[in-house]
């Protein structure tokens, strides 16, 4: 039995609120149960030096957690003068995932930065960030078209992400913190709405897992991701 009483494949209630702040070209508050992440998309002219002259755009991301997003206060990384390895890993994952959603040639030499700030953490912050940031990205692209910055929508497909894992011997979807901290296996799946995989990150925290368990994790992950795509589309309707 899961602590929340959810079934093995049941995801938490998910809410996506668009235009959450007034300044960003795309702004979304995404909630997976008690996990809440603010995803803001900023459009800027120009690209990083290594991209100049290629006629393509760029998508990058930054990720952070507010000091009291967790049970105990964590100090601001800015105060320490450097980002931690976990933060760097997560923001690279977010950026890689979102770049896979676009035809960068159609973006022109423009950069979109996704800032994902965790307001409250209860597991699955990186997957919530990707799912919410994709909606913020769509709104930023709409803004760019309305201002004549781009002529054609570069979006190839929506993307979303979901955590899965093995908890007390059972494959489950969308782990909350109490499950994540005790899971025997922890995995994140990033997928396109067409059913293709962008990234699968999986680690046996305790007992190694079998190929049969891997297949089951991918199966319940795909089922949950289908629900997330429906929620994204409803938010954008």
Curated annotation (Swiss-Prot):
It comes from the Bacteria. Keywords: Nucleotidyltransferase, RNA-binding, rRNA processing, Transferase, tRNA processing, tRNA-binding. Phosphate binds at residues 86, 124-126. GO terms for molecular function: 3'-5'-RNA exonuclease activity; tRNA binding; tRNA nucleotidyltransferase activity. InterPro entries: ExoRNase_PH_dom1, ExoRNase_PH_dom2, ExoRNase_PH_dom2_sf, PNPase/RNase_PH_dom_sf, Ribosomal_Su5_D2-typ_SF, RNase_PH, RNase_PH_bac-type, RNase_PH_CS. PROSITE patterns: RIBONUCLEASE_PH (PS01277). GO terms for biological process: rRNA catabolic process; rRNA processing; tRNA processing. Its EC number is 2.7.7.56. This is Ribonuclease PH. It comes from Alteromonas mediterranea (strain DSM 17117 / CIP 110805 / LMG 28347 / Deep ecotype).
